[in-house]
């Protein structure tokens, strides 16, 4: 669905200059396993049903003019899950990255690629690459851990506050304006701790495989009403 058509039908506010569109949206696509159980499937089956929502969200954000999206694929803690589930979400992340690489995007996969848990198929994506016409920055966190991300800070303790962002592993990812989490959980789960310091955080109770455009619309309407203080 073209988001401008959707927006025109649902809420004319988003079409005007009054709408504050976030430059960078973080996406925590939670609830895949609970969705599977609710639909009579084993827990490992739900991840595949999260692929189309990821592509749909990308298209909606691109049409709206969002400049950057970061998807939370899986964390180093997630790899402690049962092998069947782990294999399923790793495969889903590989498939998702390959699917997004067919779009117009500047794509980057970020995570601990030195670990055996990092899928080898995604190694070529650990350097940002332009696909199609490029334009929108797409970041995909794979085998990501906040401790891994910040580990360089121990070696750069003398760095000034303004230079800290250059020392972390995710230094090519911008500050996040809005984080949207599906699945109802009210926590960030270690999502980009430095870039998310002043992020607004919106939670959607529906599970990720049940994504619908209204979710994004509701998040953007809520975001538009927030005061931008940055601690001031």
Language-model region placement:
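Flexible, compositionally biased loop and terminal segments
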Residues: 2-232
């Amino acid at each position: 669905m073209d988001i401008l058509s959707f927006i025109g039908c649902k809420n004319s506010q988003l079409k005007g200059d009054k709408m504050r569109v976030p430059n960078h949206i973080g996406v925590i696509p939670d609830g895949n396993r609970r969705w599977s159980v609710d639909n009579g499937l084993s827990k490992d089956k739900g991840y595949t049903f999260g692929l189309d929502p990821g592509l749909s969200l990308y298209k909606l954000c691109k049409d709206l003019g969002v400049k950057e999206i970061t998807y939370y694929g899986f964390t180093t803690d997630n790899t402690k899950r049962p092998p069947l589930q782990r294999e399923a979400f790793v495969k889903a992340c590989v498939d998702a990255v390959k699917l997004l690489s067919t779009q117009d995007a500047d794509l980057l996969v970020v995570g601990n690629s030195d670990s055996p848990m990092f899928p080898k198929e995604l190694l070529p994506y650990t350097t940002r690459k332009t696909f199609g016409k490029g334009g929108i920055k797409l970041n995909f966190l794979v085998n990501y851990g906040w401790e891994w991300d910040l580990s360089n800070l121990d070696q750069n303790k003398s760095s000034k506050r303004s230079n800290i962002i250059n020392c972390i592993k995710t230094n090519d990812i911008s500050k996040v304006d809005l984080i949207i989490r599906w699945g109802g959980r009210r926590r960030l789960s270690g999502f980009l701790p430095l870039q998310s310091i002043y992020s607004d955080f919106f939670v959607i109770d529906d599970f990720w495989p049940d994504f619908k455009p209204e979710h994004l619309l509701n998040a953007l309407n809520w975001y538009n009403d927030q005061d931008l203080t940055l601690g001031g």
